[in-house]
Amino acid sequence: MPITPRNIVRHELIGLECRVVKSLGPPYEGLEGRIVDETKNTLVLKTESGEKVIVKDQVLLELKLPSGERVRVDGALLVGRPEERLSKRIKYAEVVRGRFDPEDYLD
């Protein structure tokens, strides 16, 4: 099954290009790189300056899908291991509307 904006929360994230659009906590904003590892609460990004660990529930992420499409996702929806996220019931509206300002979800 291909990764789409509608099913991104249920997919494996390792290998996807990622950019931190907004951060509620530490200064993650602006970090860009490829996701190389994932735990229940964190993502590890390989950036030009090395690997950076970011806390999922503190950020708004922009993920580049294999199709080239970009989607913004509230990191709080990604908390949990990929196999745990499969059983979560998440509505698509939650993916495109989260805790951040609506303008943050637009390009």
Curated annotation (Swiss-Prot):
SMART domains: POP4. The keyword Cytoplasm applies. It is found in: Cytoplasm. GO terms for cellular component: cytoplasm; ribonuclease P complex. GO terms for biological process: tRNA 5'-leader removal. It comes from the Archaea. Its EC number is 3.1.26.5. GO terms for molecular function: ribonuclease P activity; RNA binding. It catalyses: Endonucleolytic cleavage of RNA, removing 5'-extranucleotides from tRNA precursor. Part of ribonuclease P, a protein complex that generates mature tRNA molecules by cleaving their 5'-ends. HAMAP family: RNase_P_1 (MF_00754). Consists of a catalytic RNA component and at least 4-5 protein subunits. This is Ribonuclease P protein component 1.
